[in-house]
């Protein structure tokens, strides 16, 4: 398999984004991310609903990225051999739990020539297992039909790659991974060498944002709404005297806790009674400041402890304006080289999965995908 100029298909279905991307080496051929809006009315992501949405949307997105990359060619020979029939029967077994996807697959795939895809990089975890399985089974079905190898990718490694790809980083480095399901400090002694040195003991930071947004009566997803309100008053603060705790700020270790901060917001909101728009803005601003202060303090501590001068930040919460600016200021003042995902690639996407697959191919570190399974609780340092 080509190592440097491979065409790689990336597939990401770990939560509520259905995402596919095609790359040729470091060149992006196509990249589409579809966010499932159906969850907004429920204030959170329902795994089985996410699974159904992935199954409905994967094939149409796949068609689109093939067309965008000019890789969709009508098949020349339409003669169905016994071998072809056996392959399609195997596909039927792979996708038996996704009948809508199976129907779309059998209608479209036999009508096109095999595209020159060298490998399929797909998220194996962590994430919602029903959602992960749809992407994995789609990858397995394509691999079965076209005899293409699968590269299992850790979703959190994808977030690191989205910040680092195409750049030169010095090791040791520290990665701060902040998302709806994770708040982790990861020590990297080299590429693919990960050690989790700090993590949340309860709520992840993105989860805390969503829960506080719910307390304030804001729509889902809560992170952007909290940020919007906070930014509207940050410069003036409206004379607010609100003060929320900075959990585990001086705990002496590298761990986090955001459950108590969320509870403090709940008690404050109950004490204040009916919240005005200004109240909501001031609470959002103080909450965001508290989170940011803790994240910066813990990261500063781990960088000093391991004498690291490189900081990598990835995950959906890294799109937050206040958090980004705080870390940019911190890095500039402390001679730290900062790598942070662009806002467009901070949230879940398939481009980071494809690039992670490419990096593993180049380094001969690609894991076998023959026995790939969905692993909802997969750790970044787990090489199963």
Predicted ranges, named:
Residues 6-10, 119-121, 131, 173-177, ...:
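Short glycine-aspartate micro-motif
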Residues 6-116, 122, 126, 159:
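N-terminal beta-alpha supersecondary unit
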Residues 74, 78-113, 228-311, 320-334, ...:
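A contiguous, well-structured pocket-lining segment that forms one wall/lid of small-molecule binding clefts
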Residues 123-125, 142, 179-181, 311-320:
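Glycine-rich beta-strand-to-loop/alpha-helix junction loops that act as flexible
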């Amino acid at each position: 398999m080509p190592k440097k100029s491979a065409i790689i298909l990336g597939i990401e279905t770990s939560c509520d984004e259905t995402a596919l991307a095609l790359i040729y080496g470091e060149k992006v051929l196509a990249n589409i991310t579809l966010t499932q809006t159906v969850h907004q009315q429920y204030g959170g992501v329902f795994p089985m609903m996410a699974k159904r949405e992935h199954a409905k949307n994967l094939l149409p997105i796949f068609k689109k990225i093939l067309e965008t990359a000019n890789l969709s060619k009508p098949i020349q020979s339409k003669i169905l051999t016994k071998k072809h029939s056996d392959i399609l029967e195997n596909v039927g077994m792979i996708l038996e739990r996704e009948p809508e996807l199976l129907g779309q697959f059998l209608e479209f795939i036999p009508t096109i020539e095999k595209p020159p895809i060298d490998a399929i990089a797909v998220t194996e975890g962590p994430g919602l297992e029903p959602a992960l399985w749809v992407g994995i089974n789609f990858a397995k079905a394509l691999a079965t039909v076209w005899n293409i190898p699968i590269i299992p990718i850790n979703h959190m490694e994808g977030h690191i790659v989205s910040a680092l790809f195409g750049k030169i980083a010095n090791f040791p480095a520290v990665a701060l991974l902040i998302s709806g399901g994770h708040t982790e400090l990861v020590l990297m002694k080299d590429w693919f060498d990960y050690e989790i040195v700090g993590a949340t003991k309860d709520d992840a930071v993105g989860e805390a944002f969503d829960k506080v947004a719910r307390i304030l009566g804001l729509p889902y997803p809560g992170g952007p709404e909290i940020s919007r309100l906070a930014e509207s008053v940050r410069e003036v603060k409206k004379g607010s005297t609100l003060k929320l705790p900075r959990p585990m700020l001086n705990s002496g270790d590298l761990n986090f806790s955001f459950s108590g901060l969320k509870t403090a917001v709940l008690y404050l909101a109950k004490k204040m009674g009916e919240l005005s728009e200004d109240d909501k803005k001031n609470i959002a601003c103080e909450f965001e400041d508290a989170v940011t202060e803790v994240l910066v303090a813990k990261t500063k501590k781990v960088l000093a402890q391991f004498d690291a001068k490189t900081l990598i930040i990835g995950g959906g919460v890294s799109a937050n304006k206040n958090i980004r600016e705080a870390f940019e200021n911190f890095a500039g003042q402390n001679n730290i080289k900062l790598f942070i995902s662009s806002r467009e690639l901070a949230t879940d996407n398939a481009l980071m999965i494809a690039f992670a697959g490419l990096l593993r191919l180049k380094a001969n570190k690609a894991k076998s995908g023959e026995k790939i399974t969905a692993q909802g609780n997969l750790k970044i340092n787990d090489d199963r």
